[in-house]
Amino acid sequence: MSLSEARFHDLVDATQQALEDLFDESGMDLDMENSAGVLTVKFEGGAQLIFSRQEPLRQLWLADRSGGFHFDYDEESKKWVCEKSEELLGEMLERIVWERAGEKLDFDEI
């Protein structure tokens, strides 16, 4: 069953806030900007992650230099799941942040 528009926006807002909090608490040298529902995380060295919402598809999108990834929310697991690889958003972020910034962060709650 597809997410309602309101539920979708609530989930994306909560996810983006959790990401901001996690990055803020990490002590990493980075810049963040959240504007018009798009969260951009810029790492030292120029790498960046861009999180955006795709309302018509009810998806959370992640752009990274390795590509674009589209995530659907799974109500059963309460997690965002990549539509192609079925990798969880948190798992992918742990890998990407390690590759881009050399930092180990715990994204289990994402």
From Swiss-Prot:
The lineage of its organism: Bacteria, Pseudomonadati, Pseudomonadota, Gammaproteobacteria, Pseudomonadales. Belongs to the frataxin family. Involved in iron-sulfur (Fe-S) cluster assembly. May act as a regulator of Fe-S biogenesis. It comes from Pseudomonas putida (strain GB-1). It comes from the Bacteria. Pfam families: Frataxin_Cyay (PF01491). GO terms for cellular component: cytosol. GO terms for molecular function: ferric iron binding; ferrous iron binding. GO terms for biological process: iron-sulfur cluster assembly. Keywords: Iron, Metal-binding. This is Iron-sulfur cluster assembly protein CyaY.
